[in-house]
Amino acid sequence: MPASPEPVTATPEPEEVPAKFTLEAADIAVVVVYFVFVLAVGIWSSIRANRGTVGGYFLAGRSMTWWPIGASLMSSNVGSGLFIGLAGTGAAGGLAVGGFEWNAAWVLIALGWIFVPVYISAGVVTMPEYLRKRFGGQRIRIYMSVLSLILYILTKISTDIFSGALFIQVSLGWDLYLSTVILLAVTALYTIAGGLTAVIYTDALQTVIMVIGAFVLMFIAFDKVGWYEGLLVQYEKAAPALTVPNTTCHLPRSDAFHIFRDPVTGDIPWPGLIFGLTVLATWVWCTDQVIVQRSLSAKNLSHAKAGSVLGGYLKVFPMFFVVMPGMISRALYPDEVACVDPDECQKICGAKVGCSNIAYPKLVVELMPVGMRGLMIAVMMAALMSSLTSIFNSSSTLFTMDIWQRIRPRASEKELMVVGRVFILLLVALSIVWIPVIQTANSGQLFDYIQAITSFLSPPITTVFIMAIFWGRVNEQGAFWGLMVGLVVGMVRMIMEFVYGTPSCGETDLRPSLLKDVHYLYFALILLALTVLIITAVSLCTAPIPEKHLVRLTWWTRHSKEERVELEDPWAKPAGSDLSTTESEGSDEDAPAWWKRAGMWLCGLSQTTKQDLTEEERQALEKKLTSIEEDHMWKTVCNVNALILLTANVFLWGYFA
């Protein structure tokens, strides 16, 4: 699963997809104009952004307002993988997958009201850094950083590139490598040049365009199928002409229009959807660097909360503009989107296991008018870029702050900035090398396992964060062994999934009952419970962390005014070299050559000599960056809006249950 709580239906990469149409001049013009515009926004935001310090490059100088944060929370999570995967799963199984989107509202409120206040008062830039301050020592922080980077490279980047490539191939018939390399190049260019401010502004722009394009397509598609009543009738009949004898795989599910499904036989059982999914969603929305980094860049806590509420409202819509259009695509083109005969599917999309993933691109190609089609293609590219940009930026933050600083504790600010940029280039190279792996891997399994990987690897992390915030008695030994045991159990289940695989239509299911009968969302709950037991037992058997070390690191101490005594850290940087200080960069008397100036601008290094901050300035800056005080009026506005959001959310669950 991409580390976002959306399942994606399995479909291998198409081998040869013929161009379905030649692009009209208007379509090409729209794509070109759009990309020029995106680059311009990226460059404009980087010129006015504070890119010269680590805090500025990675946290947008803690100056963002609520609306770009809310839009960015949405678009970081709504990549092209979501469009293709969510629509494909909707086409294959109906509405239930939309519950993955609606669940996010609750967890986003938890992010703004519970997690972010603790992170801000703790004064942290990355999630592993919080764990280091909370527990001391390095092993948890390094474990978390390395695990996150592996998850990013193997799940997020590969999913996004796979989905983007699938979209380009189905809709344009372009060469896969050329289009992907161009996309990655443009993405890397403005991530490197702009840092997080460029990412957040371009994200906000992309969200607007994505949502408009998706809404236009939604109305065209609903009009074509006869609106919701027409969809109810046509989806029930949407079976392909060619079927596998003596099977029912080709028939639409009888519970397709219900979100809550049987707890034992359902493809997405309702207790798993409510409780198990919340475990995965808490990892994604409350402890994952990509998402939390957005909220930490807010100018104050009220802006972070309002961003969460806006993000929650925006997450209502994918059910209507992604999942339902996926179902409409099956209703309109059942022979292609719903194919089950392996040879027929191979002809249609180059994938024997089924073609439900082509549901969304198929709609774009068949239904969009000229010009709008170009816009939708641009939007899908934008979704891919937005996701990749977030991952590149957050991965380089993790690498520089948590891994590079371990290797070189005395690295200067300038060195950290350069290493962050170089690491992004390394990620781009890895991504391009990864493309043939995705093409040749059985991607039917790859996509199933991306969901599974999240349920097998994330519950222990979720558990550690929740317990660290709410229970001061949890110590480093408890957290570490909880993570380790959870990792081993999750890996055992994951390896079993790889070994046994999922049977296709007409095959008998020979998997052991642990795989066959325990849904991955149930497994997430079991793993959570196991990790809680291990953490509790080990923590109670070992010495507690003295309270002087926990000031402003737990929910109960977040408002404390006491001085926190940091836990011993053998790797700590020498005093005075933290984020807030800006080192003097000796400038030559002669102005550097133009190419050197351009290179320094690209890496966020200014030629002007900066003075070290005085002790008073440093304390004032630190106080501003760790303040969770709120204006009473805005606090009330945020609370009321959060209540309205959750009430609307409950109504929607009830209506479609």
Curated annotation (Swiss-Prot):
Family per similarity comment: Belongs to the sodium:solute symporter (SSF) (TC 2.A.21) family.
Topology Cytoplasmic: residue spans: 46-79, 126-147, 202-207, 287-307, 397-417, 473-478, 542-636
Designated name of the protein: Sodium/glucose cotransporter 4
Topology of the protein relative to the lipid bilayer: Multi-pass membrane protein
Keyword Glycosyltransferase: no
The keyword Nucleotidyltransferase appears for this protein: no
Compartment(s): Membrane
CDD domains for the chain: SLC5sbd_SGLT4
Lineage, uppermost ranks: Eukaryota, Metazoa, Chordata, Craniata, Vertebrata
Positions annotated with a glycan in the UniProt record: 246
Superkingdom: Eukaryota
Transmembrane spans: 25-45, 80-100, 105-125, 148-168, 181-201, 208-228, 266-286, 308-328, 374-396, 418-438, 452-472, 479-499, 521-541, 637-657
Listed InterPro entries: Na/Glc_symporter_sf (IPR038377), Na/solute_symporter (IPR001734), Na/solute_symporter_CS (IPR018212)
A GO molecular-function descriptor: D-glucose:sodium symporter activity
Function: Probable sodium-dependent sugar transporter.
Entry-linked PROSITE patterns: NA_SOLUT_SYMP_1 (PS00456), NA_SOLUT_SYMP_2 (PS00457), NA_SOLUT_SYMP_3 (PS50283)
